[in-house]
């Protein structure tokens, strides 16, 4: 891997770790609002189209109109799935065995996205 590839990745990971430090103190309500804000930002029609156009231009695959629809459906589905999910703080407590489960941000998650599903 050459430095022109590594440098942007290092910059992104640094920014993600900085964001993680901020999110460490967020409550469940704040995380829920953040999740909804990100979803609505993606669903905003001009931004959705921009993302769809970028995906088609970057991969050479698909059709912009189909990508716009897919972005819309998948984003709404993800928000629906995350809506009632506990993601920070106390998740479960079992007093019978004295075990409590807590969730918190633990690190940066990165993935290589298949070009067929950007």
Regions found by a protein language model. Give the residues of each.
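N-terminal Rossmann-like NAD(P)+-binding subdomain of aldehyde/semialdehyde dehydrogenases
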Residues: 1-100
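Substrate-binding/gating loop at the entrance of the active-site cleft, primarily
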Residues: 90-118
């Amino acid at each position: 891997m050459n430095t022109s590839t590594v440098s942007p990745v290092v910059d992104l990971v640094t920014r993600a770790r900085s964001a993680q430090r901020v999110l460490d103190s967020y409550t469940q309500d704040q995380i829920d609002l953040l999740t909804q804000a990100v979803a609505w930002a993606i669903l905003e029609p001009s931004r959705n189209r921009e993302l769809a156009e970028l995906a088609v231009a970057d991969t050479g695959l698909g059709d912009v109109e189909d990508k716009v629809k897919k972005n819309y459906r998948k984003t709404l589905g993800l928000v629906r799935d995350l809506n009632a999910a506990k993601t920070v703080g106390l998740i479960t407590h079992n007093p019978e065995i004295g075990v409590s489960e807590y969730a918190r941000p633990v690190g940066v998650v990165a993935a290589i996205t298949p070009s067929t599903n950007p």
